[in-house]
Amino acid sequence: MNEALLALDRGDLATAQRLMGSAVEVPEAGQGIGFLQMHEGKYADAVRSFGNTPSNALAIAQIMQGQYADATRTLAAVAQPNGETAYLKAVVAARTNDLQGLISNLRSAIAQDSSYALRAQRDLEFAAFSQTPEFVALVK
């Protein structure tokens, strides 16, 4: 399984697929297969592969499917939320036109890791909000 994830990280999808196929009996295989499916743009399949365990990865697949309510529930249930969790909540807020949710969650992400400020400045997810005073003040 680890070799498959390393191949996926290198962009070697063929090797990752081959190695994932031989690792389906491994308990963590669903996560690895879900990552592979996300790289292939198969987000609905990835959601199924990730299963019911709340994770940032599951939320990303749900966001890419337009399942914002599901992604919100998933992110709220992540066992150990981190800056990425807060950033993803901000993405969901942006996609649902919730400026206050965007600002609140982006503030939390930046408080945990200041690099999220620069990332948010460049992220097209926030383009519609990039000129609002609240957003500008937060990411400066």
Roles of regions detected by a PLM:
Residues 1-3, 7:
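N-terminal leader/linker segments that initiate helical-solenoid repeat arrays
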Residues 5, 17-20, 103, 107:
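Residue-level detector of alpha-helical secondary structure
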Residues 13-16, 46:
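Long, low-complexity, Ser/Thr/Pro-rich intrinsically disordered stretches
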Residues 9, 27-140:
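Alpha-helical protein-protein interaction modules
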